[in-house]
Amino acid sequence: MLFRSAPNGTGTIKVGGNYAASLVAGEIAHSKGYAAVLYLDPKEKKYLDECGPANFFGIRGNSYITPQSHSILPSITNKSLQQLAEDMGLTVERRPVPFEEIATFDEAAECGTAAVIAPISQIDDLDENKSFVIAKDGKPGPVCEKLYHKLRAIQYGDEPDTYGWISIIE
């Protein structure tokens, strides 16, 4: 089991060492055909942390669930998605998320600046030889789809920015 950050380390700060620590796990994952690595917390090794260089969130019923951790970089994209989720009527839960909870998600995704939302269709636990299929058809779920389109519409100016997120530079 490999970890991206150390307990009480620099995981919450954008520094090169945080990315370097993930290179080995990323190489192993890519050599086995995986797109990304889902990291657990470095202290108790049982709570979801983040997905490669991006934040993780899951949708279950009417809840947007994202890890609260002292070892991950806070994401502006995740924060924006949480606001949009609340505005859509979802309950936002920011808390420690046990790994086993993956089996209960209707949708899951990683989120960050580059992709905004990258849906996750399956998570494989190679240590325990378990697979969790989240998107049976491999497509984004309806909540991820709505969140993605809403945020992109605000970013591109197709919808008004009522949050003060966009600055016009002349």
Give the positions of each predicted feature.
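Helix-start/capping segments and mature chain N-termini
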Residues: M1-E170
